């Protein structure tokens, strides 16, 4: 039997999603909890492998099991065995054609900026603090150069293992609510550090250090060294993964949910 789960987690205390030797990861914690409930070893496949410090409100995983359990066992039962900063949000039995990564048609990330001269206390691990005067309207305008299928070499991590630098950005929006600026970007898939590298360069535009057209120029240059530094990890959230409607997976609010001014 193949089971899909929706997962939410605060990634600030983990060395990323993917299981690694001798460090704490989200995948390891989830697999341990699932294995307890299933009473057999469980290995999961995820839609997107988030880096250290990165969060998710809309991660999707699937796994194979011989265990027959009620839905509440895969939600409430697994959550009892998870740390407080990881939670199962929904469960659905799926057919064998479903794959959390390979049947996904799009991923969506939100990057949350706390724009204030003084750093936050309560939300310090859930937002990235950037002081100074940031013009989110200019960031939004510059971000429109990213739309469509393009070569994103300038926004690709040096250690990225993808066979191609081409990705298709479906939509990107930059908006402000009070002290919070949200960079919301959806694409068919993302390169390693692609969102954080894009945000780092958009911030240079928003801070007035570069013109709006700089993003277009960076795309044409195809040179990671010409773009800005990678933005901090703690403001980044995987908020949604899109699948064909035929799978009828549950849909929840995207998040992250903050009390905004």
UniProtKB/Swiss-Prot annotation:
Gene3D superfamilies hit by this protein: Pseudouridine synthase I, catalytic domain, C-terminal subdomain (3.30.70.660), Pseudouridine synthase I, catalytic domain, N-terminal subdomain (3.30.70.580)
Chemical reaction(s) catalysed: uridine(38/39/40) in tRNA = pseudouridine(38/39/40) in tRNA
CDD domains in UniProt: PseudoU_synth_EcTruA
Keywords: Isomerase, tRNA processing
Keyword Oxidoreductase attributed: no
GO molecular function: RNA binding; tRNA pseudouridine(38-40) synthase activity
Residues engaged in binding substrate: 109
Domain of life: Bacteria
Catalytic residue positions: 51 (nucleophile)
Presence of keyword tRNA processing: yes
Cited InterPro entries: PsdUridine_synth_cat_dom_sf, PsdUridine_synth_TruA, PsdUridine_synth_TruA_a/b_dom, PsdUridine_synth_TruA_C, TruA/RsuA/RluB/E/F_N
Example GO biological process: tRNA pseudouridine synthesis
EC number: 5.4.99.12
Summary of subunit composition and partner proteins: Homodimer.
Function field: Formation of pseudouridine at positions 38, 39 and 40 in the anticodon stem and loop of transfer RNAs.
Family: Belongs to the tRNA pseudouridine synthase TruA family.
Listed name of the protein: tRNA pseudouridine synthase A
